[in-house]
A protein has these predicted regions:
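Amphipathic helix-loop-helix modules that constitute alpha-helical solenoid scaffolds
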Residues: 32-118, 146-158, 194-198, 214-219, ...
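Amphipathic alpha-helical segments of tetratricopeptide repeats
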Residues: 9-13, 46-56, 121-125, 161-171, ...
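Hydrophobic, small-residue-rich alpha-helical packing segments that form membrane-like cores
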Residues: 148-251
Length: 441
């Protein structure tokens, strides 16, 4: 079985205490990374308690731990000394439990995942084994890159680079593959789409032909590659890659990968004008993620599904439906942790703004909708990434057009075209340029 802990294997009650704890850790990890969230949490919570590991039960407690971890690493640095003695089995199990929780929760509960990532790094630095430090440092450093602050992003990228050098020093292809993938994730967060695709696919190559045991690493790499291809508008590359990933995920019974791959299949269908197929992909993904084993909340998977659904509504000239979808999800989005993370934050703000602007074309409440779109554009303009500022310029131009300010609209669309080209987003640039040409008529 995919989880590696199926009921038809040797009964767990026959295992010794050390083997039992290892089996619990593996079960928690595999449940979580494959999308069996409730099953994973049911194993992880008592496991963390039994090992005296922190498991923050509220968002505020998790945020407090993040602040303390950040201060700790700022004060002590990330230096370490090679170990002078082997790691005790109980301590090794705690390290691996932290790692299992950090990666297993990363695309479900990023705030709690970050607390485990910090605990993992703290313990790995204390022990000093270079391979474990490389793994922990690369993963923890993504927290800085994800936020969007230029200063923190630079620090995060420097730490990821150091982790990659440590991994290369070990000669372990799995560790080198992981840190290569994480370098690609950092590229994506910085808007370097082509480099992101190159690096995450190089990381997959370093992992070799293995599928079991590195499923999470392969899934994260593929998810990043799919997102980068969407930003590039490279639909001919996206479709076959997403379909191949979906087939593999179905063979493994990997719910997480089935959902994410299926949604990118939906994007490829939408680009091919298969609106019904795109809608079906979104519906299938939502149903699968809402099946048994998923906790309440608004996860990465909900964000990806909402983006495809809103795109379908706009492509089908249904702005009321697009706005209703975003508005219905907005309270859950606000209470989630996704707006702390740069990539979904930019996408979600743009999604809401585009829905508002589209509806303003046909609504009697035009003034209110234009104010909403303008406010969201202002938020996007404050983001450090160029493509966010491009989206802001295009949205402001759209607002100006509906207000009858044609010269301002032309300037805005021209600026957005330049910025989208600078962001290596030719399809977005072409769409804006088409709107600019329409204004010239």
């Amino acid at each position: 079985r995919y989880t590696g802990v199926s009921a038809d294997e040797a009964p767990l009650h026959r295992l010794g205490s050390g083997q039992w704890e290892k089996a619990r850790r593996k079960a928690a990890e595999q449940y979580l990374v494959s999308g069996r969230v409730l099953d994973g949490l049911a194993v992880l919570r008592p496991l963390a308690r039994d090992q005296d590991l922190p498991f923050p039960e509220t968002p505020n407690r998790a945020k407090l731990r993040l602040v303390l971890d950040s201060a700790r690493f700022t004060l002590r640095g990330i230096h370490f000394s090679p170990p002078t003695a082997p790691l005790a089995p109980a301590d090794a199990l705690r390290l691996e439990t932290c790692w299992s929780a950090a990666k297993g929760l990363s695309f479900i509960d990023p705030l709690r995942a970050a607390t485990f990532a910090g605990e993992h790094l703290r313990r790995c630095l204390a022990h000093g084994e270079p391979g474990r430090v490389a793994r922990a440092l690369a993963h923890y450093a993504l927290l800085d890159v994800n936020i969007g602050s230029p200063r923190k992003a630079a620090r995060g990228q420097a730490r990821i680079q150091r982790a990659h050098h440590l991994a290369q020093g070990t000669g372990d292809p799995l560790l080198i593959g992981l840190t290569t993938i994480i370098r690609g994730v950092a590229d994506l967060n910085c808007g370097r789409w082509r480099r992101a695709v190159t690096r995450v696919e190089a990381g997959i190559d370093r992992l070799g032909e293995r599928r079991l045991g590195v499923t999470w690493e392969r899934s994260i790499a593929r998810a990043m590659a799919m997102h980068a291809l969407v930003m590039l508008g490279d639909w001919p590359a996206l479709g076959p890659r997403a379909a191949a990933w979906l087939r593999e995920a179905e063979e493994l019974g990997d719910r997480f990968a089935c959902v994410v791959a299926g949604l990118y299949v939906g994007h490829a269908r939408l680009a091919d004008a298969d609106l019904a197929g795109a809608r079906q992909a979104a519906a299938t993904a939502r149903a699968l993620w809402s099946a048994d084993g998923v906790v309440d909340g608004f996860h990465f998977q909900h964000w990806l599904a909402l983006g495809l659904e809103v795109a379908c509504e706009l492509a089908d000239a249904r702005p009321h439906a697009a706005w209703q979808r975003v508005s219905a999800a907005w309270p859950a989005i606000g209470t989630s942790d996704l707006l702390r993370i740069q990539v979904p934050r930019i996408d979600i703000l743009g999604m809401r703004a585009h829905a508002a602007l589209a509806l303003a074309h046909v609504s009697s409440d035009r003034s209110s909708l234009l104010r909403t779109a303008a406010a969201l554009a202002a938020s996007l303009a404050r983001e450090p990434l160029v493509h966010a500022r491009a989206a802001a310029a295009a949205l402001r131009a759209g607002v100006a057009e509906l207000r009858g300010e044609r010269p301002a609209a032309r300037r805005g669309f021209a600026r957005a075209t330049e910025l989208f080209h600078a962001s290596d987003m030719p399809v977005h640039a072409a769409c804006v340029r088409r709107r600019l040409a329409a204004l010239a008529c």
